[in-house]
Protein backbone atom coordinates (compact mmCIF):
# COMPACT_ATOMS: atom_id res chain seq x y z
CA UNK A 1 0.00 0.00 0.00
CA UNK A 2 1.40 3.42 -0.99
CA UNK A 3 2.04 6.15 1.56
CA UNK A 4 -0.77 8.45 0.27
CA UNK A 5 -3.27 5.58 0.49
CA UNK A 6 -2.15 4.77 4.03
CA UNK A 7 -2.45 8.42 5.04
CA UNK A 8 -5.93 8.61 3.50
CA UNK A 9 -7.06 5.57 5.50
CA UNK A 10 -6.02 7.33 8.71
CA UNK A 11 -8.12 10.41 7.97
CA UNK A 12 -11.53 10.77 9.68
CA UNK A 13 -14.53 9.70 7.61
CA UNK A 14 -15.70 13.30 7.36
CA UNK A 15 -12.48 14.20 5.55
CA UNK A 16 -12.39 11.11 3.35
CA UNK A 17 -16.00 11.53 2.21
CA UNK A 18 -16.87 15.18 2.92
CA UNK A 19 -19.99 15.43 0.73
CA UNK A 20 -21.44 12.13 1.93
CA UNK A 21 -20.77 13.16 5.52
CA UNK A 22 -22.48 16.53 5.06
CA UNK A 23 -25.43 14.78 3.40
CA UNK A 24 -25.88 12.46 6.38
CA UNK A 25 -25.38 15.24 8.95
CA UNK A 26 -28.00 17.35 7.16
CA UNK A 27 -30.43 14.44 7.22
CA UNK A 28 -29.88 13.91 10.96
CA UNK A 29 -30.45 17.58 11.78
CA UNK A 30 -33.55 17.71 9.57
CA UNK A 31 -35.00 14.61 11.26
CA UNK A 32 -34.69 16.24 14.69
CA UNK A 33 -36.33 19.44 13.42
CA UNK A 34 -39.13 17.55 11.64
CA UNK A 35 -40.10 15.49 14.67
CA UNK A 36 -40.18 18.59 16.86
CA UNK A 37 -42.39 20.70 14.58
CA UNK A 38 -44.45 18.23 12.53
CA UNK A 39 -47.84 18.92 14.23
CA UNK A 40 -47.66 22.49 12.91
CA UNK A 41 -47.01 21.17 9.40
CA UNK A 42 -50.06 18.90 9.61
CA UNK A 43 -52.22 21.78 10.86
CA UNK A 44 -50.95 23.98 8.04
CA UNK A 45 -51.82 21.36 5.40
CA UNK A 46 -55.35 20.89 6.79
CA UNK A 47 -55.91 24.67 6.77
CA UNK A 48 -54.73 24.94 3.17
CA UNK A 49 -57.29 22.34 2.05
CA UNK A 50 -60.28 23.98 3.76
CA UNK A 51 -62.90 25.62 1.52
CA UNK A 52 -61.18 24.55 -1.71
CA UNK A 53 -63.31 26.22 -4.42
CA UNK A 54 -62.34 23.82 -7.22
CA UNK A 55 -64.00 20.90 -5.40
CA UNK A 56 -67.40 22.31 -6.38
CA UNK A 57 -66.77 21.04 -9.93
CA UNK A 58 -66.95 17.45 -8.68
CA UNK A 59 -70.53 17.98 -7.43
CA UNK A 60 -72.32 15.93 -4.77
CA UNK A 61 -71.30 18.35 -2.05
CA UNK A 62 -67.62 17.69 -2.64
CA UNK A 63 -66.78 21.16 -1.38
CA UNK A 64 -67.72 21.08 2.26
CA UNK A 65 -67.69 23.94 4.71
CA UNK A 66 -64.48 24.21 6.69
CA UNK A 67 -64.86 22.06 9.82
CA UNK A 68 -62.34 24.16 11.76
CA UNK A 69 -61.45 27.84 11.91
CA UNK A 70 -57.92 29.00 12.51
CA UNK A 71 -54.76 27.24 13.56
CA UNK A 72 -55.57 26.53 17.22
CA UNK A 73 -59.10 25.24 16.60
CA UNK A 74 -57.85 23.12 13.72
CA UNK A 75 -55.20 21.51 15.94
CA UNK A 76 -57.68 20.99 18.79
CA UNK A 77 -60.18 19.50 16.36
CA UNK A 78 -57.62 16.97 15.17
CA UNK A 79 -56.82 15.97 18.77
CA UNK A 80 -60.48 15.69 19.81
CA UNK A 81 -61.76 13.85 16.73
CA UNK A 82 -58.76 11.79 15.65
CA UNK A 83 -56.47 11.53 18.66
CA UNK A 84 -53.30 13.25 19.87
CA UNK A 85 -50.91 11.01 17.93
CA UNK A 86 -52.68 11.91 14.67
CA UNK A 87 -50.81 15.20 14.88
CA UNK A 88 -47.85 13.15 13.62
CA UNK A 89 -49.78 11.41 10.82
CA UNK A 90 -47.49 11.33 7.79
CA UNK A 91 -44.30 11.93 9.77
CA UNK A 92 -42.56 8.82 8.38
CA UNK A 93 -42.58 9.95 4.72
CA UNK A 94 -41.76 13.45 5.98
CA UNK A 95 -38.56 12.13 7.54
CA UNK A 96 -37.77 10.14 4.38
CA UNK A 97 -38.30 13.33 2.42
CA UNK A 98 -36.03 15.46 4.56
CA UNK A 99 -33.16 12.99 4.51
CA UNK A 100 -33.16 13.31 0.71
CA UNK A 101 -34.29 16.94 0.45
CA UNK A 102 -32.15 18.52 3.16
CA UNK A 103 -29.14 16.40 2.31
CA UNK A 104 -29.43 17.30 -1.37
CA UNK A 105 -29.99 21.01 -0.89
CA UNK A 106 -27.24 21.50 1.70
CA UNK A 107 -24.58 19.64 -0.26
CA UNK A 108 -25.58 21.40 -3.49
CA UNK A 109 -25.51 24.87 -1.92
CA UNK A 110 -22.10 24.40 -0.32
CA UNK A 111 -20.67 22.99 -3.56
CA UNK A 112 -21.98 25.97 -5.52
CA UNK A 113 -20.69 28.40 -2.89
CA UNK A 114 -17.22 26.91 -2.47
CA UNK A 115 -16.45 25.49 -5.93
CA UNK A 116 -18.68 26.92 -8.66
CA UNK A 117 -19.24 30.55 -7.60
CA UNK A 118 -16.54 31.02 -4.98
CA UNK A 119 -16.11 33.66 -2.29
CA UNK A 120 -14.09 36.84 -2.61
CA UNK A 121 -10.65 37.16 -1.02
CA UNK A 122 -12.11 38.80 2.10
CA UNK A 123 -14.51 35.82 2.54
CA UNK A 124 -17.44 37.95 1.33
CA UNK A 125 -20.11 36.04 -0.61
CA UNK A 126 -22.21 38.35 -2.84
CA UNK A 127 -25.96 38.27 -2.27
CA UNK A 128 -26.78 37.54 -5.92
CA UNK A 129 -24.62 34.42 -5.82
CA UNK A 130 -26.30 33.30 -2.61
CA UNK A 131 -29.77 33.85 -4.11
CA UNK A 132 -28.97 31.80 -7.22
CA UNK A 133 -27.27 29.11 -5.15
CA UNK A 134 -30.17 28.87 -2.72
CA UNK A 135 -32.76 28.57 -5.49
CA UNK A 136 -30.74 25.97 -7.42
CA UNK A 137 -30.13 23.93 -4.26
CA UNK A 138 -33.85 23.98 -3.46
CA UNK A 139 -34.82 22.86 -6.95
CA UNK A 140 -32.39 19.93 -6.99
CA UNK A 141 -33.15 18.78 -3.46
CA UNK A 142 -36.93 18.97 -3.91
CA UNK A 143 -36.98 17.24 -7.30
CA UNK A 144 -35.15 14.27 -5.78
CA UNK A 145 -37.53 14.20 -2.80
CA UNK A 146 -40.84 14.72 -4.65
CA UNK A 147 -42.17 11.13 -4.26
CA UNK A 148 -41.81 11.25 -0.48
CA UNK A 149 -43.38 14.71 -0.33
CA UNK A 150 -46.36 13.48 -2.36
CA UNK A 151 -46.95 10.60 0.05
CA UNK A 152 -46.56 12.90 3.07
CA UNK A 153 -49.20 15.38 1.85
CA UNK A 154 -51.71 12.66 0.97
CA UNK A 155 -51.24 10.78 4.24
CA UNK A 156 -51.75 14.00 6.21
CA UNK A 157 -55.29 14.14 4.80
CA UNK A 158 -56.24 10.54 5.64
CA UNK A 159 -57.61 11.38 9.09
CA UNK A 160 -59.91 14.00 7.59
CA UNK A 161 -61.16 11.53 4.94
CA UNK A 162 -62.05 9.04 7.69
CA UNK A 163 -64.09 11.65 9.55
CA UNK A 164 -65.94 12.54 6.34
CA UNK A 165 -66.91 8.90 5.85
CA UNK A 166 -64.65 8.47 2.83
CA UNK A 167 -62.58 5.29 2.37
CA UNK A 168 -58.94 5.50 3.37
CA UNK A 169 -56.57 5.47 0.43
CA UNK A 170 -53.53 3.96 2.12
CA UNK A 171 -52.72 1.40 4.82
CA UNK A 172 -49.28 2.85 5.44
CA UNK A 173 -46.27 4.54 3.86
CA UNK A 174 -45.11 1.64 1.73
CA UNK A 175 -48.66 0.89 0.58
CA UNK A 176 -48.99 4.55 -0.42
CA UNK A 177 -45.84 4.38 -2.55
CA UNK A 178 -46.98 1.12 -4.15
CA UNK A 179 -50.50 2.39 -4.88
CA UNK A 180 -49.36 5.67 -6.40
CA UNK A 181 -46.81 3.80 -8.50
CA UNK A 182 -49.42 1.26 -9.65
CA UNK A 183 -52.01 3.90 -10.56
CA UNK A 184 -49.80 6.57 -12.08
CA UNK A 185 -46.50 4.88 -12.84
CA UNK A 186 -43.17 6.61 -12.27
CA UNK A 187 -44.78 9.81 -13.53
CA UNK A 188 -47.35 9.58 -10.73
CA UNK A 189 -44.62 9.80 -8.08
CA UNK A 190 -43.63 13.18 -9.48
CA UNK A 191 -47.16 14.60 -9.53
CA UNK A 192 -47.03 18.24 -8.55
CA UNK A 193 -43.27 18.48 -9.04
CA UNK A 194 -43.47 21.83 -10.85
CA UNK A 195 -45.17 23.78 -8.01
CA UNK A 196 -43.06 21.76 -5.60
CA UNK A 197 -39.74 22.96 -7.01
CA UNK A 198 -41.14 26.47 -7.42
CA UNK A 199 -41.89 26.49 -3.71
CA UNK A 200 -38.52 24.92 -2.87
CA UNK A 201 -36.69 27.58 -4.88
CA UNK A 202 -38.49 30.36 -2.99
CA UNK A 203 -38.19 28.72 0.43
CA UNK A 204 -34.48 28.06 0.03
CA UNK A 205 -33.90 31.55 -1.28
CA UNK A 206 -35.44 32.59 2.03
CA UNK A 207 -33.82 29.93 4.21
CA UNK A 208 -30.34 29.19 2.87
CA UNK A 209 -29.69 32.62 1.39
CA UNK A 210 -30.93 34.51 4.46
CA UNK A 211 -29.12 32.27 6.96
CA UNK A 212 -25.84 32.35 5.07
CA UNK A 213 -26.00 36.10 4.41
CA UNK A 214 -27.07 37.14 7.93
CA UNK A 215 -24.62 34.78 9.64
CA UNK A 216 -21.58 35.93 7.69
CA UNK A 217 -22.62 39.57 7.95
CA UNK A 218 -22.78 39.24 11.75
CA UNK A 219 -19.44 37.42 11.92
CA UNK A 220 -17.62 39.86 9.62
CA UNK A 221 -19.22 43.15 10.70
CA UNK A 222 -20.18 42.84 14.38
CA UNK A 223 -18.48 41.67 17.59
CA UNK A 224 -20.48 38.42 17.39
CA UNK A 225 -18.50 35.26 16.68
CA UNK A 226 -19.50 32.06 14.87
CA UNK A 227 -21.39 30.65 17.85
CA UNK A 228 -24.86 29.61 19.02
CA UNK A 229 -26.03 33.23 19.39
CA UNK A 230 -25.16 34.01 15.78
CA UNK A 231 -26.71 30.76 14.59
CA UNK A 232 -29.92 31.50 16.52
CA UNK A 233 -30.33 35.05 15.20
CA UNK A 234 -29.60 33.95 11.64
CA UNK A 235 -32.09 31.09 11.79
CA UNK A 236 -34.84 33.38 13.17
CA UNK A 237 -34.42 35.65 10.16
CA UNK A 238 -34.30 32.76 7.69
CA UNK A 239 -37.49 31.18 9.06
CA UNK A 240 -39.49 34.40 8.65
CA UNK A 241 -38.29 35.16 5.12
CA UNK A 242 -38.80 31.55 4.00
CA UNK A 243 -42.41 31.60 5.25
CA UNK A 244 -43.25 34.87 3.49
CA UNK A 245 -41.79 33.72 0.18
CA UNK A 246 -42.91 30.11 0.32
CA UNK A 247 -46.51 30.08 1.62
CA UNK A 248 -48.34 30.90 -1.67
CA UNK A 249 -46.37 28.24 -3.56
CA UNK A 250 -46.95 25.83 -0.66
CA UNK A 251 -50.74 26.28 -0.91
CA UNK A 252 -50.66 25.58 -4.66
CA UNK A 253 -48.34 22.61 -4.19
CA UNK A 254 -50.48 21.01 -1.48
CA UNK A 255 -53.68 21.34 -3.49
CA UNK A 256 -52.21 19.91 -6.66
CA UNK A 257 -50.65 16.97 -4.84
CA UNK A 258 -53.85 16.16 -2.91
CA UNK A 259 -56.35 16.50 -5.78
CA UNK A 260 -58.19 13.40 -7.09
CA UNK A 261 -56.82 11.91 -10.31
CA UNK A 262 -58.08 9.85 -13.24
CA UNK A 263 -56.67 6.48 -14.27
CA UNK A 264 -53.97 8.17 -16.34
CA UNK A 265 -52.78 10.09 -13.29
CA UNK A 266 -54.12 13.44 -14.54
CA UNK A 267 -55.59 15.83 -11.99
CA UNK A 268 -59.37 16.32 -12.01
CA UNK A 269 -59.31 19.82 -10.48
CA UNK A 270 -56.28 21.63 -11.85
CA UNK A 271 -54.44 21.51 -15.17
CA UNK A 272 -51.30 23.19 -13.86
CA UNK A 273 -49.94 25.28 -11.02
CA UNK A 274 -51.03 28.42 -12.90
CA UNK A 275 -54.57 27.06 -13.24
CA UNK A 276 -54.63 26.27 -9.51
CA UNK A 277 -53.39 29.78 -8.71
CA UNK A 278 -56.08 31.41 -10.86
CA UNK A 279 -58.89 29.24 -9.46
CA UNK A 280 -57.81 29.91 -5.87
CA UNK A 281 -57.67 33.69 -6.32
CA UNK A 282 -60.91 33.89 -8.33
CA UNK A 283 -62.87 31.49 -6.13
CA UNK A 284 -61.51 32.33 -2.69
CA UNK A 285 -59.69 35.65 -2.97
CA UNK A 286 -56.00 36.60 -2.97
CA UNK A 287 -55.50 35.89 0.72
CA UNK A 288 -56.36 32.23 0.08
CA UNK A 289 -52.72 32.00 -1.05
CA UNK A 290 -51.74 32.69 2.55
CA UNK A 291 -54.00 30.09 4.13
CA UNK A 292 -51.97 28.38 6.78
CA UNK A 293 -49.40 31.21 6.97
CA UNK A 294 -49.48 31.42 10.77
CA UNK A 295 -48.76 27.72 11.39
CA UNK A 296 -46.32 27.80 8.48
CA UNK A 297 -44.42 30.68 10.09
CA UNK A 298 -44.72 29.24 13.59
CA UNK A 299 -43.40 25.95 12.23
CA UNK A 300 -40.74 27.35 9.91
CA UNK A 301 -39.13 29.53 12.56
CA UNK A 302 -38.63 26.80 15.21
CA UNK A 303 -37.85 24.28 12.44
CA UNK A 304 -35.18 26.58 11.11
CA UNK A 305 -33.77 27.18 14.60
CA UNK A 306 -33.71 23.49 15.54
CA UNK A 307 -32.23 22.50 12.18
CA UNK A 308 -29.47 25.10 12.03
CA UNK A 309 -28.47 24.83 15.69
CA UNK A 310 -28.39 21.03 15.44
CA UNK A 311 -26.61 21.06 12.09
CA UNK A 312 -23.90 23.49 13.20
CA UNK A 313 -23.38 21.55 16.44
CA UNK A 314 -23.08 18.10 14.86
CA UNK A 315 -20.73 19.52 12.22
CA UNK A 316 -18.55 20.81 15.04
CA UNK A 317 -18.74 17.47 16.89
CA UNK A 318 -17.87 15.58 13.69
CA UNK A 319 -14.88 17.74 12.87
CA UNK A 320 -16.51 19.44 9.88
CA UNK A 321 -15.95 23.16 9.40
CA UNK A 322 -18.87 25.52 10.24
CA UNK A 323 -21.44 26.19 7.53
From Swiss-Prot:
Catalytic activity: H(+)(in) = H(+)(out); chloride(in) = chloride(out)
Regions crossing the membrane: 23-40, 88-109, 127-144, 195-212, 229-248, 288-311
GO molecular function, one term: protein homodimerization activity
Membrane topology: Multi-pass membrane protein
Keywords: Membrane, Mitochondrion, Mitochondrion inner membrane, Repeat, Transmembrane, Transmembrane helix, Transport
Gene Ontology cellular component terms for the protein in this record: apical part of cell; mitochondrial inner membrane; mitochondrial membrane; mitochondrion; neuronal cell body
Regulation: Proton conductance is up-regulated by unsaturated long-chain fatty acids and inhibited by purine nucleotides ATP and ADP. The transport of chloride ions is partially inhibited by long-chain fatty acids.
Keyword Transmembrane in annotation: yes
Tissues expressing the protein: Found in adult and fetal brain. Present in most of the brain tissues, with low levels in spinal cord, corpus callosum and substantia nigra.
Keyword Ribonucleoprotein: no
GO biological process annotation, one example: negative regulation of mitochondrial membrane potential
Compartments where found: Mitochondrion inner membrane
Residue ranges of Solcar repeats: 21-115, 125-217, 226-317
Subunit structure: Homotetramer.
Protein function: Facilitates proton transport across the inner mitochondrial membrane and may dissipate excessive proton gradient associated with oxidative and metabolic stress at neuronal synapses. Regulates glutamate-induced proton conductance in astrocytes, shifting the energy metabolism toward aerobic glycolysis and lactate transfer to neurons for ATP synthesis. Can transport chloride ions with lower efficiency. The transport mechanism remains to be elucidated.
The family this protein is said to belong to: Belongs to the mitochondrial carrier (TC 2.A.29) family.
Name of the featured protein: Mitochondrial uncoupling protein 4
Species: Homo sapiens (Human)
Amino acid sequence: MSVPEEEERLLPLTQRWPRASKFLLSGCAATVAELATFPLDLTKTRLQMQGEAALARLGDGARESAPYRGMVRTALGIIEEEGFLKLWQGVTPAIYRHVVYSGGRMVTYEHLREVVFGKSEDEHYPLWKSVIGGMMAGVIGQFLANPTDLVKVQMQMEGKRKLEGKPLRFRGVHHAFAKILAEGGIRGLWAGWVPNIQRAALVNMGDLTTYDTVKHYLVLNTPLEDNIMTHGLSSLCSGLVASILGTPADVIKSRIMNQPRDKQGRGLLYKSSTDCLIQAVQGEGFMSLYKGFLPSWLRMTPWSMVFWLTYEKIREMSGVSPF
